[in-house]
From Swiss-Prot:
Its EC number is 7.1.1.-. It is an enzyme of class 7 (translocase). This is NAD(P)H-quinone oxidoreductase subunit J, chloroplastic. Keywords: Chloroplast, Membrane, NAD, NADP, Plastid, Plastoquinone, Quinone, Thylakoid, Translocase, Transport. The keyword Lipoprotein does not apply. NCBIfam families: PRK12494.1. Belongs to the complex I 30 kDa subunit family. NDH shuttles electrons from NAD(P)H:plastoquinone, via FMN and iron-sulfur (Fe-S) centers, to quinones in the photosynthetic chain and possibly in a chloroplast respiratory chain. The immediate electron acceptor for the enzyme in this species is believed to be plastoquinone. Couples the redox reaction to proton translocation, and thus conserves the redox energy in a proton gradient. The keyword Metal-binding does not apply. One of its GO terms (cellular component) is chloroplast thylakoid membrane. Signal peptide: none annotated. NDH is composed of at least 16 different subunits, 5 of which are encoded in the nucleus. It comes from Psilotum nudum. SUPFAM superfamilies: Nqo5-like (SSF143243).
Amino acid sequence: MQGRVSVWLSQHKLAHRPSGFDYQGIEIIQIKSEDWPSIAVALYIYGFNYLRSQCAYDVMPGGFLASVYHLTKLQDNADQPEEVCIKILVSRESPKIPSIFWVWKSADFQERESYDMSGIHYESHPRLKRILMPESWIGWPLRKDYVVPNFYELQDAY
């Protein structure tokens, strides 16, 4: 079943795949990485003027990485603002997604955190560098195949 945003994207011939709705009724749309800049601008023009959150996660060990954007259409006197969830899957061998910092400035720290923890490179981001981990850190801590360096398990003496 297509939601309002998916219908609108189809009318404007923007490539996407409807993925249903979450438990709150928020429409989920999956897109390809290369289509993200044009779809982001189109959604901003459509009225999604607020990036509520952005996150990244490892779908499964050895599988895809996902970057998820939650967009909200803020309007005056709106009790129930319209929301949409955009999901982008990328390969872990070359995890690259165009940054949407230039559309929603609030993506700055959120994309940096996703880069720092999951290793997704947000192309054309103005300050893409580690934000939580030291610059010397090796690897991406939130990937399911990550091995903590120099980890020693403490055992009970009893």
